[in-house]
Swiss-Prot record:
The gene is murB. It holds the Pfam family MurB_C. Its cofactor is FAD. This is UDP-N-acetylenolpyruvoylglucosamine reductase. Pathway: Cell wall biogenesis; peptidoglycan biosynthesis. GO terms for biological process: cell division; cell wall organization; peptidoglycan biosynthetic process; regulation of cell shape. GO terms for cellular component: cytosol. One of its GO terms (molecular function) is flavin adenine dinucleotide binding. It comes from Helicobacter hepaticus (strain ATCC 51449 / 3B1). Its EC number is 1.3.1.98.
Amino acid sequence: MQTHIINFAKYSSIKIGAPLEVSLIQTPQDAISALSQNMRIIGKANNLLVSPAAQKLAMLDKHFAYLKDCGNYIEIGGAYSSGRIFSYFKSHNLAGAEFLQALPGSLGGLVKMNAGMKSYEIKQLLQAINVNGKWQDRESFPMNYRDSGIEGVILAARFHKREGFNNALQADFIALRKNHPKEPSCGSCFKNPKGDFAGRLLESVGLKGYCIGDAAFSEKHANFLINKGKATFEDALSLITLAKKRVFEASGIDLECEVQILQ
């Protein structure tokens, strides 16, 4: 596989990291090779915290940044961005992708974590998923809350094609997005535990706005891990560790990370 250098301090959404070698997946055979070498897929690094010492990283090449109308369904490559998916669905009056207005990332990452907002999740759009070069029905995978259960490299997906883009729903998601912090962020740091909210739990133990170095939990939304300027990987990891400890001691709830930590 070809490789190139990515500076995660510039590339990742939280702007933390260092220049690291990343392998390019250009074919299904490359995907299988990456798996055999235990490589981690970085996508657009929107929900990743990457150590300066991380190794065995890979990403989909631009060959997988495509979208095509196949008549009864839309096929989208794993490297295609959420913003472009949203724009296509809106301009072609297709329903279901309104929530992507507020979610950054690539198709592969969205499917991998079954991304969503409120009651809307990517699984509701999916017909089939191409994993390691093999198409499988969406029902083949668990597709749980923020975890698809997919083990492998997501090369593409097929979306149901339904008419009726909902402009009112888009407006709701735009309003939600306004409550998100403006600083570099990895998005939601922790998954919401059943029957509760991670942000509420973090706020209840005094961590809203709390900083270690330049890593902080946002004043706007406690579950957003942000970079106030020069945060390091160690700052962010220490803050996550502290948060899990405080919440567990106060409530007995073991918070599960939504951000993926690559060490």
